A protein has these predicted regions:
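Compositional signal for N-terminal targeting/processing segments
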Residues: 1-124
Length: 124
């Protein structure tokens, strides 16, 4: 993503919350990501998350549908979960940067982030 941005002379920013700014708050809520992953593994009869990932996304014949398949996968994986305290903190930080960038550009911006964060950021 950085190389492509450089080629088209796009401005780039790292928008994740720096480690030094993260609170040490511990969230003891169940790990929704692990629960969702276990459900997907059972539903697809796959042995582990690597096998599932290869089956869903590494087959070159599926490359044209990859963006929508990834969006669907992470939306299902995340569900309605707000995430743990650290992810909520990180996503709030990212959302502020995204809002700032949209104001600077009078519109759309491209965000490259982990798939777990994409559904939450799209709602903010």
């Amino acid at each position: 993503a950085l190389q492509a941005a450089r080629r088209i002379q796009a401005q780039t920013y790292f928008i994740d919350l720096p480690c030094w700014a993260q609170s040490e708050e511990v969230d003891d809520s169940p790990d929704t990501q692990e629960e969702s992953q276990a459900l997907l593994l059972r539903a697809t009869r796959m042995d582990n998350s690597d096998t599932l990932w290869d089956h869903l996304f590494e087959d070159e014949s599926q490359q044209t549908a990859l963006p929508s398949a990834l969006a669907h996968y992470f939306a299902q994986l995340r569900g309605d979960s707000p995430g743990d305290a650290l992810n909520r903190q990180r996503e709030a930080f990212m959302a502020r940067w995204i809002g700032w960038a949209m104001q600077q550009n009078n519109g759309d911006v491209l965000v490259v982030c982990g798939g777990w964060h994409a559904p939450a950021l799209a709602k903010m």
